UniProtKB/Swiss-Prot annotation:
Species for this entry: Saccharomyces cerevisiae (strain ATCC 204508 / S288c)
GO CC terms: cytoplasm
Catalytic activity: AMP + diphosphate = 5-phospho-alpha-D-ribose 1-diphosphate + adenine
Record's keyword terms, sorted: Acetylation, Cytoplasm, Glycosyltransferase, Purine salvage, Transferase
Gene3D superfamilies (alphabetical): 3.40.50.2020
Pathway the protein acts in: Purine metabolism; AMP biosynthesis via salvage pathway; AMP from adenine: step 1/1
Protein name, UniProt field: Adenine phosphoribosyltransferase 2
Length: 181
């Protein structure tokens, strides 16, 4: 068993499930216990870092873009480990300055995401990170913001992909996930 496989098993055991959250009929996969455990959090970042270095060794990653809310929790640590910049993708009204925005549907309501337009220079290479890929709407919206400023998405990276929801079908770049469910 590789180190990454061993780490994945440990990470999986830390997830907590909440039924009927945030809406009835949904099962919420909570990865916050991973963040609360420094050893496990280091293993999470190490797993992503190792994957990205192996896959994009010669191709420069310029930025990690973290999606609100949980991509903002581990994205900066991953960016720091890789020695690249970090860009937050936030809900409307959370970022100062000129922002690109996109409206999208999430579960049973519309949301608006924003990203500062000067945060990612034209022609940059970006990896988008978030905790869970479900239907793909949130990740698609984040990718659209990145494309609006003329940057390239190398990959979407998730801690967990809910395979039965086929969210990867909406995305325009490859995905990587530590766990699948």
């Amino acid at each position: 068993m590789s180190i990454s496989e061993s780490y994945a098993k440990e990470i999986k055991t830390a997830f907590r499930q909440f039924t009927d959250f945030p809406i009835e009929g949904e099962q919420f996969e909570d990865f916050l216990p991973i963040i609360g455990n420094p050893t496990l959090f280091q293993k999470l970042v190490h797993t992503f870092k190792t994957h990205l270095e192996e896959k994009f060794g010669k191709e420069k990653i310029d930025f990690i873009a973290g999606i609100e809310a949980r991509g903002l929790l581990f994205g900066p640590s991953l960016a720091l480990a890789l020695g690249v910049g970090f860009v937050p993708i936030r809900r409307v009204g959370k970022l100062p300055g000129e922002c690109a925005s996109i409206t999208f549907t999430k579960l049973d309501h519309e949301e608006i995401f924003e990203m500062q337009v000067e945060a990612i220079p034209f022609d940059s290479n970006v990896v988008v990170v978030d905790d869970v890929l479900a239907t793909g709407g949130t990740a698609y919206a984040a990718g659209d913001l990145i494309r609006q400023v003329g940057a390239h998405i190398l990959e979407y990276d998730f801690v967990l992909v809910l395979d039965s929801l086929h969210g990867e079908e909406k995305l325009s770049a490859p995905i990587f996930s530590i766990l699948h469910s």
